[in-house]
């Protein structure tokens, strides 16, 4: 845990085997974790990690998204290689701490986001390459899907105001999906295979983490042009973004540090 106001490391949270993702809900003051080492998601109040509770899900969870109006957490699961079991996404009711649905998807998932205007979750599927939509209110199957013409949809975020998704693919391309027309467009090349992406709605910037060669591609989303590249470290494929203070955190595995970047 990092104190983002004072840029200070505080401590680590134990008991989260293979933790792959972390999501903080400002609306509910809760923290959610995807624990890939044991097929669970963790739930605890912000600042009260001793209150950690776990809910078993239908696979090895990776990406997380949350609908605060329904206390609905979606965990996008992955499976182990050569596992014949279908890949699923799991819906968890976080107030009752129960699994409410397990929905089969076409293949291995990556990241996921929640669309508060449509009350839908969008989930990247790596193979076959597509984005699937799942209704938050009635998650009984796939509500819509968008084919992505590139290998490995990975990073995903949403521009709610302009009704579009940003999708960064392992093949090295950045795509947008117009949610009104369903049009998919390749808008730019990337500096390498991406991982996590975040959209800054205040500055209209998109941050794309590139683990090799180790940088963050920054795009102006009004023009969809690359505005700058920021050097991080080889292997730094995970970033976090605090929209309240406009800081990006890049986690540097080789040097065991977190680099902090501020846009003004």
Name each region found by the language model.
Residues 1-264:
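Predominantly soluble domains enriched in secretory-pathway, periplasmic, or organellar proteins
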